[in-house]
């Protein structure tokens, strides 16, 4: 796997599942992770929110930016990408 230290990943659906697993793996290399997901409140049957994911990513060694995004709405995606680029100085990798 390439070195992801200092790289910025924008990951949709990173609050749980495969998205979170990818984020935590990249965080171990020191990556910056923008967590783009809808989950801000705990679900009764599914673990994780964008905030708990951010904690896990930072515990793994990365930097996290939790963003409330519903990918069905282009304006929300564009706003989140703009926020990510401003916060981390750009976006290197997009995972949807």
Annotate each language-model stretch with its function.
Residues 92:
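Conserved acidic residues
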Residues 2-89:
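Short-chain dehydrogenase/reductase
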